[in-house]
């Protein structure tokens, strides 16, 4: 029997607790496809290049590029609506936002990307002619 495997879904919730004590829950739903993994990797490479550029000399243009790249990562992984809510929650404080959210991305989402890539690689090995 030939088996087709559906793409993995990443489902999670992030709760935002505001200064006034109120909370808002962001529902994260990400279908992990090879294209999503590829686009995330491209954004990672872009962020690393911008970090090198930033270290060689801080200027407003580089800071703006880093901010835009961070927003691109969040749009890809969390969706535009959730990214907008995150920007509002952090009041556009990119440093705090990155400090708090990148460990979540690295600890929760990236391992799922790695699992999907590994499963895909194993599936290709089985299907070789």
What is each PLM-predicted segment?
Residues 1-58:
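Short N-terminal mixed-charge amphipathic segments
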Residues 7-13, 63-66, 113, 123-124:
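Low-complexity, flexible helical/coil segments
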Residues 37, 48, 71, 99-102, ...:
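Residue-level detector of alpha-helical secondary structure
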Residues 56-70:
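Contiguous, amphipathic alpha-helical segments that mediate oligomerization or scaffolding
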Residues 77:
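Conserved catalytic core of Hanks-type protein kinase domains
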Residues 80-129:
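C-terminal charged interaction modules
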